[in-house]
């Protein structure tokens, strides 16, 4: 499309929307661009920053609503940070906000990964910034810890949920899959809480009636058909490289990726390195390293890999393919989340899933701390950051920048 046509379309869109709607969408876009540009450290950091912005600072959502979105997003494949952001975008800006929030969150990470991939192909190595970013890790850990503390106080409001949380967190350390723990935790919650929980129409926000039925959105059936088609195509293509085959691979992975984003590494190793030979072992390790030290979810390593394999077109195709299912799953969840609060048993299930999600986040923090808190300087930075952020509502970006400077001074001297 030519530039003047794009400009005309933009002007027409501005006239079509009222001032308040345009203001909401612009605030949403700015927020998601900021999150996408600064969310270093994984999905939990992005969720912590999102909680600070939309719950504590802007008060767009209550803590309970935010927890419901996190809990539901953990039940479907894909990066929770992207799906939660998209869902929040819909609640604040409608379907246009749904699209804008997702694009603005993903675009900065994809752009940064593409720049790193270009440098990698030009110089054959990673830029030397990993050592600097190591100093930010205690700050990131403190931000994550504060978010889990705040959300946990809302989610775990009785002894039954506390038992479920302890069970899920403990089981995760013994290697039980995240999705299994979420489903088991939800089922236990239905049994322990469903008998004791009464739901009024005011609490559910939905008028109750005897003939109310739980509706399964059409998007769910569309997703199942799409996944079946992908499996059929996947079983019948050769390992020769093309944009179409690259797209099929990442669509398939994104439709099946439950739990930690690190499961992605197993898919990449098994098919791109071992089966197809599209990547070398070193290229895969470098792609994962880049994803860890730059903003965005681990799945955004697909952008880096796409560029290595097929240049700019490969980066675009890989990025769209790895994140497209998240938009579809989020669209399916939008109608489901509100319905879950409309019934006693499903509300109990969601409460338990929320608690299980918080427990899994706590387990992630403990696991990360084992590799981050190995020096006394790291402990000092963690404690200072946590106390400051707990006492005052300091923007996460300032905490990260300040922590990086303090870390540089402490580790230098």
Enumerate the language-model features and the residues they cover.
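Multi-pass membrane proteins that catalyze or facilitate reactions on polyprenyl-/lipid-phosphate substrates
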Residues: 3-76, 87-294, 298-413
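Conserved beta-loop-alpha segment that forms the PLP phosphate-binding cup at the N-terminus of a helix
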Residues: 80-83
């Amino acid at each position: 499309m030519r530039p003047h046509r794009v400009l005309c379309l933009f002007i027409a869109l501005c006239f079509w929307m009222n001032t308040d709607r345009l203001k909401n969408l612009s605030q949403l876009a700015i927020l998601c661009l900021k999150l996408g540009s600064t969310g270093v450290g994984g999905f939990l950091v992005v969720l912590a920053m999102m909680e600070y912005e939309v719950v504590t600072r802007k008060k767009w959502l209550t803590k309970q609503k935010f927890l419901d979105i996190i809990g539901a997003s953990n039940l479907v494949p894909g990066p929770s940070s992207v799906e939660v952001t998209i869902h929040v975008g819909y609640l604040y800006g409608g379907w246009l906000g749904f699209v804008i929030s997702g694009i603005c969150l993903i675009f900065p990470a994809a752009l940064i990964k593409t720049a790193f991939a270009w440098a990698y192909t030009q110089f054959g190595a990673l830029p030397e910034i990993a050592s600097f970013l190591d100093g930010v890790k205690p700050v990131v850990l403190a931000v994550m810890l504060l978010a889990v503390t705040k959300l946990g106080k809302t989610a775990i409001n009785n002894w039954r949920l506390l038992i479920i949380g302890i069970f899920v967190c403990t089981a995760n350390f013994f290697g039980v899959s995240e999705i299994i723990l979420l489903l088991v935790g939800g089922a236990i919650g239905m049994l322990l809480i469903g008998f004791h929980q009464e739901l009024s129409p005011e609490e559910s926000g939905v008028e109750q009636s005897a003939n109310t039925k739980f509706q399964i959105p059409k998007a769910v059936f569309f997703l199942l058909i799409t996944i079946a088609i992908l499996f059929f195509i996947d079983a019948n293509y050769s390992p020769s490289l093309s944009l179409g085959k690259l797209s099929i691979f990442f669509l398939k992975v994104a439709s099946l990726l439950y739990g930690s984003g690190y499961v992605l590494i197993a898919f990449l190793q098994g098919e791109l390195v071992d089966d197809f030979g599209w990547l070398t072992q070193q290229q895969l390790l470098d792609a994962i390293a880049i994803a860890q030290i730059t903003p965005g979810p681990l799945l955004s390593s697909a952008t880096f890999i796409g560029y290595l394999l097929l240049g700019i077109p490969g980066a675009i195709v890989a990025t769209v393919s790895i994140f497209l299912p998240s938009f579809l799953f989020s669209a399916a969840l939008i109608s489901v989340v509100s319905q879950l609060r409309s019934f006693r048993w499903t509300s109990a299930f969601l409460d338990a899933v929320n608690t299980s999600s918080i427990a899994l986040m706590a387990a992630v923090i403990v696991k990360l701390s084992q590799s981050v808190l190995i020096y006394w300087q790291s402990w000092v930075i963690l404690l200072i950051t946590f106390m400051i952020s707990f006492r005052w509502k300091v923007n996460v970006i300032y905490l990260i920048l300040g922590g990086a400077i303090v870390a540089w001074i402490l580790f230098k001297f």
